[in-house]
């Protein structure tokens, strides 16, 4: 009932804005092109392609299920020993010829004006030739693997995978970043200094030391573009930060909390479930139905947590890993299961509910939408997911998020309504610093720092 009362006060102002955001997002996907005027996003356009993974191959992690917890952010000098690896599945179970191209982007993820030869060492249009057919799975698929070639410049990049038979048919895109550590970054996380949000938000304060890079700096307060991202999510990023103090003698820029744009909603620890085996129930799986042509996994029914006290537990901060408990060869032996999500909550008029996570690139669409079931007394939906351990949460559209002075851009979904926001939540933050050197034609990523708040021992 508390949630229904909150909706009554917020819905009138939020429904129009939320509708416009969803409509704009939908139109963007339908008219997906790579012009210099449009941003590039993580997205899967072909519904038969699934489980798109991109990660740095650290050491001998090829058989380590946790390898996908390494996000695609890499020091440019480590590309030889730690290449980026792309993996994905084709559920048509028919071999198809795929090709991949790399696009260079500026700090705002709009395509740069650079020609291929300016940022690549090799020919920038390659076939994906490493593939395997799944073994003993009820849902057959081809598993593809591709090692990303080295790039010349630090910055933002997008992998574009397309149909070899039709170069205009883009199938999916995946972002990655290469950085060169040319400046020093010192950062920390604390509760928000906004009294009204001190129990809900987290505040990141940082400073940049550019003494070793000063020859490339002409206007310190304007040259650097700072981006802060929460939990590896580009939909949870602050992009328009300006220094609050310029210490010219020390060549240091400080970013403090004068306008509170450097704050983030704390969120909650992510829910999770384990389907590494389909022969018995594992953590947060209520039931496994082993049918002749498929497996069905029922995730434990959830309830709203926004009105409850914060509870501490470990998670992957929204990520997931693919694994097959019996063989530990999840790439080709993990099966796809019809995964049922259930949220027990009163019907929310004019509101759409979604099961959300990195498995869906944090997009809210028909694939992860839940529908209300009066007999069940809650919302239920089905998503086909490969065996593994998944983090997720529940998000809604139709209600604007709580008012916050955070600089996080307008988001499509409201996660606070069901999950709540707590300043105690353990979160990862990444700081990206971009700059365009004199005479350069594109932005470069010249600094990167990852910090954690509330890590459990």
What are these regions (language model features)?
Residues 298-349, 451-457:
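Basic K/R-rich, polyanion-interacting modules in nucleoproteins and related proteins
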Residues 42-49, 177-201, 420-447:
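Low-complexity, Pro/Ser/Thr- and charge-rich linker/hinge segments at domain boundaries
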Residues 217-309:
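Long, internal scaffold/assembly segments composed of regular secondary structure
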Residues 1-40:
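Bacterial Sec-dependent N-terminal signal peptides
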Residues 51-102, 197-210, 329-341:
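Contiguous beta-strand segments within globular domains
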Residues 113, 118-142, 234-242, 338-387, ...:
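Aromatic-rich carbohydrate-binding modules that target alpha-glucans
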Residues 140-164:
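Ligand-binding face of N-terminal immunoglobulin V-set domains in extracellular IgSF glycoproteins
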Residues 152, 163-170, 278-282, 398-418:
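Short acidic/polar inter-strand loop motif in beta-rich domains
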């Amino acid at each position: 009932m508390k949630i229904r009362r909150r909706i009554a006060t917020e819905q009138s102002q939020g429904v129009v804005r939320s509708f416009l955001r969803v409509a704009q997002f939908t139109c963007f996907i339908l008219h997906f092109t790579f012009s210099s005027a449009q941003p590039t996003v993580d997205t899967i356009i072909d519904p038969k392609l699934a489980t798109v993974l991109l990660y740095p191959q650290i050491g001998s992690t090829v058989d380590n299920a946790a390898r996908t917890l390494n996000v695609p952010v890499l020091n440019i000098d480590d590309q030889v020993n730690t290449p980026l690896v792309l993996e994905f599945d084709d559920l048509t179970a028919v071999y198809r010829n795929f090709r991949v191209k790399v696009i260079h982007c500026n700090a705002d993820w709009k395509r740069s004006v650079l020609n291929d030869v300016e940022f690549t060492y090799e020919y920038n249009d390659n076939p994906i030739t490493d593939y395997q057919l799944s073994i003993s799975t009820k849902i057959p698929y081809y598993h593809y693997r591709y090692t990303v070639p080295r790039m010349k410049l630090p910055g933002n990049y997008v992998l574009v995978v397309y149909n070899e038979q039709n170069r205009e048919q883009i199938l999916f895109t995946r972002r990655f970043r290469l950085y060169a550590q040319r400046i020093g970054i010192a950062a920390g996380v604390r509760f928000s200094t906004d009294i009204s949000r001190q129990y809900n938000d987290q505040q990141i304060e940082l400073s940049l030391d550019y003494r070793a890079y000063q020859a490339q700096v002409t206007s310190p307060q304007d040259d650097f573009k700072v981006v802060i991202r929460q939990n590896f999510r580009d939909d949870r990023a602050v992009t328009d930060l300006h220094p609050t103090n310029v210490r010219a003698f020390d060549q240091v820029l400080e970013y403090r909390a004068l306008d509170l744009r450097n704050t983030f909603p704390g969120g909650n620890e992510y829910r999770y479930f384990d389907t590494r085996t389909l022969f018995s129930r594992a953590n947060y799986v209520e039931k496994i139905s082993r049918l002749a042509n498929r497996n069905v996994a029922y995730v434990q029914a959830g309830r709203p947590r926004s009105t409850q006290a914060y509870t501490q537990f470990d998670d992957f901060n929204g990520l997931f890993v693919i694994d097959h408990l019996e063989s530990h060869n999840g790439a080709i032996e993990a099966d796809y299961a019809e995964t049922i999500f259930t949220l027990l909550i009163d019907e929310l008029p004019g509101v759409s509910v979604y099961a959300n996570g990195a498995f869906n690139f944090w997009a809210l669409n028909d694939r992860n939408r839940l529908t209300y079931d009066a007999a069940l007394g809650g919302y239920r939906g089905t998503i086909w997911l490969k065996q593994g351990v998944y983090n997720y949460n529940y998000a809604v559209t139709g209600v604007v998020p709580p008012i916050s002075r955070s600089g996080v851009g307008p988001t499509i979904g409201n996660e606070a309504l069901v999950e709540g926001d707590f300043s105690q939540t353990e979160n990862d933050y990444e700081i990206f610093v971009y700059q365009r050197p004199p005479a350069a034609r594109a932005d470069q990523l010249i600094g990167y720092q990852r910090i954690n708040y509330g890590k459990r021992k």
